[in-house]
UniProtKB/Swiss-Prot annotation:
Main function: General regulator of phagocytosis. Required to uptake Gram negative bacterium by macrophages.
One of the GO biological process terms: phagocytosis
Predominant cellular place of this UniProt entry's protein: membrane
GO cellular component labels: Golgi apparatus; membrane; mitochondrion
Bilayer topology annotation: Single-pass membrane protein
A Pfam family recorded for this sequence: NICE-3
Name of the molecule in the record: Protein C1orf43 homolog
Species of provenance: Bos taurus
Record bears the keyword Transmembrane: yes
InterPro entries: C1orf43
Amino acid sequence: MASGSNWLSGVNVVLVMAYGSLVFVLLFIFVKRQIMRFAMKSRRGPHVPVGHNAPKDLKEEIDIRLSKVQDIKYEPQLLADDDARLLQLETQGNHNCYNYLYRMKALDAIRASEIPFHAEGRHPHSLMGKNFRSYLLDLRNTSTPFKGVRKALIDTLLDGYETARYGTGVFGLSEYLRYQEALSELATVVKARSGSSQRQHQSAAKDLTQSPEVSPTTIQVTYLPSSQKSKRAKHFLELKSFKDNYNTLESTL
């Protein structure tokens, strides 16, 4: 009876150790999978490095080109000139149903206005995102064609832009026409000022390139009369004879 109880206790110990080892292995696998999962979610790049087995030069070229991807921003044209949806605006009916078309036309109108938003180069992606307002206000206070433009005009343009792009209110035909009028006025002012400044630069460059006329240099030769020439020669001979007499006198002493 005692030997049977000892055998059962030994079996229980073995079972406990086996179950404990199994639970430990399962917990280890679970924790490892969770760690790998969070590590993969936190990584921005691919799970395998790009160009892992590529040559060194090719890998560097791949890294250089991939680093330029984050700087690429493109704002496509929303409505083409031959878009069939534009015909819906010409049909009779409730124009409020096509507010989204006026919003798209408002965004495309900025590119069609040919306003040099990128002339300064400080905001190369000024039409992307919310810095459109800060970009124009910044240009308005600097020495650019935007300087001195009426603040009300820029505010009307920017309010219409933000309403068309981000607003949830109504943006119909009247709002679009008001926005288009402000954009056309701003484009006219900027083009006129940029044209005048360009003409001033051209005139200044022309003045710098034109060299002043150089008057020919004249050499004035003064001829002495013969009497003065003879006097100079006589004085030279007297000076030479005096020097010779002085040298002979010094040698005799």
